[in-house]
């Protein structure tokens, strides 16, 4: 089980990403369309002034049950340990133990 502070920090980051997503995307589009160097520098400065935690790459994928950041399966939102246990208990529809 991950520390509660780490899980909460990640939740806070997700909220910030959602809050600033539109603004960040608009600045990036303007930056790509900018022609002069001074305009690009100004847009880059504005982009840098956004909160650091509002960048999507600062968010870590975590298991929604345990908060574990490693061994994460995107399809389920679970870490490998919980995925295995839930699959054995039949709690994940369509997941069967492989056999060949």
Swiss-Prot record:
GO terms for biological process: translation. The gene is rpsN. It comes from Synechococcus sp. (strain ATCC 27144 / PCC 6301 / SAUG 1402/1). PROSITE patterns: RIBOSOMAL_S14. It holds the Pfam family Ribosomal_S14. This is Small ribosomal subunit protein uS14. Binds 16S rRNA, required for the assembly of 30S particles and may also be responsible for determining the conformation of the 16S rRNA at the A site. Belongs to the universal ribosomal protein uS14 family. InterPro entries: Ribosomal_uS14, Ribosomal_uS14_bac/plastid, Ribosomal_uS14_CS. Keywords: Ribonucleoprotein, Ribosomal protein, RNA-binding, rRNA-binding. One of its GO terms (cellular component) is small ribosomal subunit. The keyword Ribosomal protein applies. One of its GO terms (molecular function) is structural constituent of ribosome. The keyword rRNA-binding applies. Part of the 30S ribosomal subunit. Contacts proteins S3 and S10.
């Amino acid at each position: 089980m991950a520390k509660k502070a780490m899980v909460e920090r990640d939740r806070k980051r997700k909220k910030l990403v959602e809050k600033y997503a539109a603004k960040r995307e608009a600045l990036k589009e303007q930056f790509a369309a900018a022609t002069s160097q001074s305009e690009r520098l100004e847009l880059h400065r504005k982009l840098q002034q956004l909160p650091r935690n509002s960048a999507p790459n600062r968010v870590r994928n975590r298991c929604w049950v345990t908060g574990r950041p490693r061994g994460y399966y995107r399809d389920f939102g679970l870490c490998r340990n919980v995925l295995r246990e839930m699959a054995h208990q039949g709690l994940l529809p369509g997941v069967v133990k492989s056999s060949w």
